[in-house]
Regions:
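A generic short alpha-helical patch detector that favors 3-5-residue windows
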Residues: 4, 92-93, 141
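ATP-binding pocket architecture of kinase catalytic cores
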Residues: 43-135, 161
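Catalytic and binding regions of secreted/periplasmic enzymes and modules that target cell-wall glycans
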Residues: 124, 140-142
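Conserved NTP-binding catalytic cores of kinases and kinase-like/nucleotidyltransferase enzymes
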Residues: 1-85, 197-202
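An alpha-helical support segment within catalytic cores of ATP-dependent transferases
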Residues: 7-18, 133-137, 144-186, 196-201
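Active-site acidic catalytic loop and adjacent metal/ATP-binding pocket
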Residues: 36-43, 49-50, 81, 170-209
Length: 209
């Protein structure tokens, strides 16, 4: 169940005043998911998904929302944040950080074929290319963190273990120095990919980065 914080039609109607999306037509909780409260929201103008972020570090949300907007703007079928009238992508609803996204089409495929996997591979390649132009911050567990953590433990290691760790760090630095970098999905599995109906698998949505 992924409605941890309930939202009433009256509360949502008031919150939607910050958007130019018309009158609220329908509100329905979404049962899938384990971290956030999600709702299908229909207004006069379009269909949306409302997310109330329950467990996410709120300082990371601007990066996430800007990334989704960037990828959607480059043709990636991911949830596009709906900007409010003042241009903001993030608000607060019932004490939770909240955002409104485009509603994507399709459904998850529980028994994918090789054709589905090929479509996902193409989508990931497109995502990586689009993400390569997005200014991502340093990874919290990246090279700087690895070097700092290794330095803290070196003094408590035996000479042999310290030498082995130093050799591995050097090997990793040499290996990763020439690799491309950029944003990735990082949580890709069947539930997070939507396929539209058709004789050829076509991805309608990539979810929950």
């Amino acid at each position: 169940m992924s409605v941890f914080t309930p939202v009433s039609p009256a509360q949502l109607t008031d919150w939607l005043q910050r958007y130019d999306l018309g009158t609220l037509v329908a509100l329905q909780g979404i049962s899938e998911g384990v971290q956030n409260s999600n709702f299908f929201v229909d207004t006069e103008d379009a269909r949306h998904v409302l997310t109330l972020f329950e467990k996410v570090d709120s300082t990371l949300l601007p990066f996430y929302l800007d990334l989704m907007a960037h990828l959607a703007g480059h043709g990636i079928p991911c949830p596009a944040p709906r900007p409010a009238r003042d241009g903001s992508l993030l608000g607060t609803l019932n004490g939770r950080p909240a955002a409104l996204f485009s509603r994507l089409s399709g459904a998850s495929v529980m028994h994918p074929t090789s054709a589905h996997c090929a479509a996902i591979g193409r989508a990931m390649a497109q995502l990586h290319l689009a993400g390569s132009t997005f200014p991502a911050p340093p990874h919290p567990r990246g090279a700087d963190w690895i070097a700092a953590t290794a330095a803290r433990v070196m003094s408590i290691l035996s000479a042999g273990d310290a030498a082995m760790l130093a050799a591995e760090l050097s090997c990793q630095r040499d290996h990763t120095a020439t690799l491309p970098g950029g944003v990735i999905h990082a949580d890709l599995f069947r539930d997070n990919v939507l396929f539209t109906d058709g004789s050829t698998p076509c991805i309608g949505g990539l979810l929950d980065f």
